[in-house]
A protein has these predicted regions:
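Short hydrophobic beta-strand element within catalytic cores of glycosyltransferases
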Residues: 246-249
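Extended catalytic core of nucleotide-activated donor transferases of GT-like folds
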Residues: 9-12, 21-112, 121-124
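A short hydrophobic beta-strand element within the catalytic core of glycosyltransferases
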Residues: 224-225
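A charged, aromatic-enriched C-terminal amphipathic alpha-helix characteristic of glycosyltransferases
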Residues: 282-316, 320, 329-334, 343-344
Length: 344
């Protein structure tokens, strides 16, 4: 199949484009949210950059939507409407940003476009109405068992921790820094120590490293810390588990499902997490054993093959929704935000 999708979430796309299809990524001269293309990523040759304005509409077999605005954009540019005469699936990456537990998904109550969540918690958190909703859990290209744990430090991967604050558990970092020095990787981590009130000697901002370098450097840390309060399941957590790192994670959203007890600690009790982090930093052998358990669990649940197989099944089924009108059913409710619809 020739599948059109925008490059919205780099890590997720990195897994998705390793399937057996041809992937069409819109590109614009200035890049940006609507034209990032490959963005220099080392992806297979089956990933092609396309100019949407000149793309042959009939060359697209299906589209993976990731933003509500893409529906109207494709109808305008291609002359084919997702869910009407263009097979489509909507991928929701995130938890609701506000209004939980009453947050209505923009595609709630339509049947033409399946709504895919990346975690079971996300599916539960959103009000999907009568939309066909399902879960396809993340898949991770295996980076290999790179863990050395040579540094008695805690590794954290988080983007924009200063701006996002409590959402990403930034306020919890001082407590972890009291246990062991922190290495923080991710976008816009400069100034984090000052913003969080942590001594510079206890926190090193590593910045946004390339994937291979990130994996290598992160794997040198003794323990991976996942302090996120309200985010979807971070792919960085799953990558750390694939690397063979033991995990200390806040028991929020999907973390309790992803991290088994033998991999470290998952708890809403911060003191319990701090005790576990301190013990693992002081005991390299235990840290390594728990890291092996983390890797085994991640390979079993979040392996790339299982992820791609699930997507193949869904893409093959587009247009044959049981009890529905198929891809030719003209459900105009997909064009109207849930909060503005009139009940039929």
């Amino acid at each position: 199949m020739r599948i059109l999708l925008w490059h919205v979430h780099g890590s997720w796309t990195d897994a998705f484009v390793r399937g057996r299809h041809e992937y069409l990524l819109p590109v614009l001269p200035g890049g940006g949210a609507w034209g990032l293309g490959r963005a220099g990523r080392d992806w297979p040759a089956s990933v092609r950059e396309v100019e949407l304005a000149t793309l042959d509409a009939e060359s697209v077999d299906a589209v993976v939507l990731q933003r509500p605005e893409e529906i109207e954009e494709l109808a305008r540019v291609l002359g084919r409407r997702p869910g009407v005469d263009l097979p489509a699936v909507y991928l929701e990456h995130n938890t609701p940003k506000e209004g939980f537990p009453f947050a209505r998904h923009p595609l709630a109550d339509q049947r033409a476009i399946p709504l895919v969540h990346v975690t079971h918690f996300n599916r539960l958190a959103w009000d999907n109405g009568s939309a066909r909703s399902l879960v396809i859990e993340h898949g991770i290209p295996d980076p290999g068992h790179l863990y050395t744990g040579e540094l008695p430090e805690l590794g954290v991967v988080v983007n924009e921790p200063v701006r996002r604050g409590r959402v990403t558990g930034t306020d919890l970092l001082p407590a972890f820094a009291s246990v062991a020095p922190l290495q923080v990787f991710g976008m816009k981590t400069d100034g984090l120590a000052a913003a969080a009130g942590i001594d510079q000697a206890r926190l090193t901002s590593r910045g946004d490293l390339k994937t291979l370098e990130l994996h290598r450097e992160l794997a040198r840390c003794r323990v991976y810390v996942h302090p996120m309060r309200w985010t979807s399941l971070g792919l960085s957590l799953l990558e750390a588990m694939h690397l063979g790192m033991p995990v200390v994670a806040l028991a929020t959203t999907e973390a309790p499902r992803a991290v088994p007890p033998e991999a470290g600690a998952v708890s809403a009790d911060i003191d319990e997490l701090l005790r576990c982090a301190q013990r693992l930093v002081a005991n390299p052998d235990e840290a390594r054993r728990r890291g092996v358990a983390a890797r085994e669990a991640a390979l079993e649940r979040y392996g790339l093959g299982k992820f791609l197989d699930r997507w193949d099944e869904l893409l093959a089924d587009l247009g044959t929704e049981p009890g529905g009108r198929g891809i030719n059913g003209r459900d105009e409710r997909i064009l109207v935000p849930a909060g503005e619809r009139k009940t039929p």
